[in-house]
């Protein structure tokens, strides 16, 4: 059990974040399933913001883990989250463009003159 699991205020905050974000990951858009409330400004570094509903975003487990893989744990900031969100959105647009281009390529285009 981590130090937050027995913190009733944290549990209420986390549930409210999930509700306010409609149980939807704010990075990839997946809805439902196991979700995690992420502090924009870190839980330990910004204790005055721990339970502020403006200091949280709902993330799926995969996106939450990827954020912390990129930025580590502790001392995280809203700036890091915004940067991560922008990178994720850029990658999503690139993937959509590639998928669209692949879908619109003529079949056997390598055999055309």
Task: List where the protein language model places each region.
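Short linker/helix segments within small regulatory modules
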Residues: 41-56
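Short Cys/His-centered divalent metal-binding micro-motifs
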Residues: 33, 56-79
